[in-house]
Swiss-Prot record:
Annotated region described as Disordered, given as residue ranges: 149-192
Species whose genome carries this gene: Schizosaccharomyces pombe (strain 972 / ATCC 24843) (Fission yeast)
Family (UniProt): Belongs to the TMEM208 family.
Protein name, per record: SRP-independent targeting protein 2 homolog
UniProt membrane topology term: Multi-pass membrane protein
This protein's encoding gene: mug69
């Protein structure tokens, strides 16, 4: 079987997407049953927060389904495997957010809608994950600014000083063999 890995990934994605759909439906149905038949009703704010949680996790489920659902032709052969749902990165964060939303919806159904205050952890997590990227971006911008002002950063200055001390005697830069050949060839053909 030449496409065994693709078929395995397609089956895995289909299984995960089916689980996500079932979990989403079960959590939302349990919320409505527990909130309206066992506990008291909801205020407008509570309905708004529930709608936000439910719609955001549903939207992410829809996006993941579009990206990862395997597609088959009329004969049943695999056309498109889909994106791996177990990969790291944005896909992983989307799945984690869905699980986080389901847990909060379920806990809000069992206890109080004050559990939705834990949604404030999401921006904190985003800042935690984005801080190293932002720091790296600011460092690169600082390097670009220094290059534009012809003021190399301190590390580059130190490297230049070391190179200058090592190669203080030759007046011309040392060329590689390839560069020497190219210059010789250019000099040969540039003569009339």
């Amino acid at each position: 079987m030449a496409n065994a890995a693709q078929k395995k990934l397609a089956a895995q994605n289909k299984h995960i997407l089916t689980f996500m759909l079932a979990a989403d439906l079960i959590v939302n149905v349990l919320f409505w049953i527990l909130r309206f038949f066992v506990r008291s009703g909801l205020s407008k704010f509570s309905k708004f927060v529930y709608a936000f949680a439910s719609i955001s996790s549903g939207f992410l489920h829809y996006q993941l389904h579009r990206a990862a659902a395997p597609k088959y032709d009329a004969r049943g052969s695999l056309l498109y495997v889909g994106q791996d749902l177990l990969q790291e990165g944005v896909t992983s964060y989307m799945v984690d957010y869905m699980y986080f939303s389901w847990i909060l919806i379920f806990l809000a159904a069992l206890t109080s809608v004050k559990v939705f205050a834990f949604y404030l952890l999401v921006p904190i997590f985003v800042v935690y994950k984005a801080a190293p990227l932002l720091k790296m971006l600011l460092q690169q911008l600082k390097n670009f600014k220094n290059q534009a002002l012809n003021q190399p950063p301190q590390q580059q200055q130190q490297q230049q000083q070391q190179q200058h001390q090592q190669h203080a005697t030759p007046s011309e830069p040392v060329l590689s063999k390839r560069q020497q050949k190219l210059r010789k060839k250019a000099a040969k053909y540039s003569r009339p």
